[in-house]
Curated annotation (Swiss-Prot):
The chain crosses the membrane at residues 22-42, 106-126, 183-203, 268-288. The lineage of its organism: Eukaryota, Metazoa, Ecdysozoa, Arthropoda, Hexapoda. It comes from Aedes aegypti. The keyword Chloroplast does not apply. Belongs to the pannexin family. This is Innexin shaking-B. The gene is shakB. GO terms for biological process: gap junction assembly; monoatomic ion transmembrane transport; response to light stimulus.
């Protein structure tokens, strides 16, 4: 098991340059690694053995029957899930059928789980890929190795001046750059909600309330309720195989199939249900947080003061008052990457320059001061 995660840690590396939020990293780093690990686990015989084992008479070769039932779907009977195991049925959902398809629950997902998990991992990484493309290495370029703070005073002074000149010359031109990141965060929210609906479709409408059903089942009298994990992920199902008999007539053969992979699948998807709910809540709160930041300069001042206590309050207020939301976002990202003393000096120098130059050029009308 550890070998799988060792192989994945290089696949989803977190850069030492911080260009996004912790919640955003949960999507493209932790979640992607979890999904990729699950995808590999369900394809590894070392952990689950053969994916399907069907039992029948010797008239049908075992490999033929297993292959047929793996390629086609297996089924259970809905009316038999509440029957008493051991006296009425051998296993929930398994028993004699009347040949009608009305009562059948077909399990079509079984062989597609690993591919679905892999596809989900790609979808979770897509907003990160988009932001990397849009961010363009701006933060790393502006850092100029000022994050370590170990360089000569002359070199440090030159780099701080270059950074200050860039901020001065491009002040109020970073809104679209910041909005692109907010779009990526919103796409992460759309993705995780969309994947809940995707998995609900994948499991024939049984996934959306899966976690709640499991909790309800654990709290109720289990003799009176259907186990949702057994209902969605049965260990034993039936498979119908047709072949010609010795007289040329079509013969129907019912086989019992053991699905050992579902022991793993149920754990995977009960975890993913709760994990996706947590991600949805955290990302929704993050989106509301971003909306407040966009429309509230006071909140931007408060957050900078809270995060970077070495920077003087009056310097922060001057910068926020004379800049836009995109500049705030860039400065916040720089502050999380630069040496704290260097960032304090840059912020103070920028505030002094803004204070001494009241007519700094502004896009739009001359002399206009915009808060957003």
């Amino acid at each position: 098991m550890l070998d799988i995660f060792r192989g994945l840690k290089n696949l989803v590396k977190i850069s030492h340059v911080n260009t996004d939020s912790p919640v955003f990293r949960l999507h493209y780093s932790i979640t992607v690694m979890i999904l990729m690990a699950f995808s590999l686990i369900v394809t590894t015989k070392q952990y689950v053995g053969n994916p399907i084992d069907c039992v029948h008479t010797k008239d049908i070769p075992e490999e033929v029957l297993n292959t047929y039932c793996w390629i086609h779907s297996t089924y259970a009977l809905k009316s038999l899930f509440l029957k008493k195991v051991g006296s009425e049925v051998p296993y929930p959902g398994v028993g004699n059928s009347d040949g009608k398809n009305i009562d059948k629950k077909i399990y079509k997902y079984y062989q597609w789980v690993c591919f679905c998990l892999f596809f989900q991992a790609i979808l979770f990484y897509t907003p990160r890929w988009l932001w990397k493309s849009w961010e363009g290495g701006k933060i790393h370029a502006l850092m100029m190795d000022l994050d370590i703070g170990i360089c000569s005073e002359i070199e440090k002074k030159q780099k701080k001046k270059l950074l200050l000149d860039y901020l001065w010359d491009n002040l109020r031109y970073h809104n679209w750059w910041a909005y692109r990141y907010y779009i990526c965060e919103f796409l992460s929210l759309v993705n995780v909600i969309g994947q809940m609906f995707l998995m609900n479709r994948f499991f024939d409408g049984e996934f959306m309330t899966f976690g709640l059903d499991v909790i309800t089942h654990m709290e109720a009298d289990q003799e009176d309720r259907m186990d949702p994990m057994i209902y969605i992920f049965p260990r034993m199902t039936k498979c119908t195989f047709y072949k010609y008999g010795v007289s040329g007539e079509v013969e129907r053969h019912d086989a019992i199939c053991i699905l050992p992979l579902n022991v793993v699948n149920e754990k995977i998807y009960i975890f993913l249900w709760f994990w996706f709910i947590i991600l949805t809540i955290l990302t929704t709160l993050t989106i509301f947080y971003r909306i407040i930041i966009i429309f509230s300069p006071r909140m931007r001042v408060y957050l900078l003061r809270l995060r970077f206590r070495l920077v003087r309050r009056d310097a922060i207020e001057i910068i926020v008052r004379r800049s836009k939301m995109g500049d705030w976002f860039l400065l916040y990202r720089l502050g999380e990457n630069l040496d704290s003393i260097i960032f304090r000096d840059v912020m103070q120098d920028l505030a002094n320059r803004l204070h001494n130059n009241q007519h700094h050029r502004v896009p739009g009308m001359k002399g206009e001061i915009q808060d957003a």
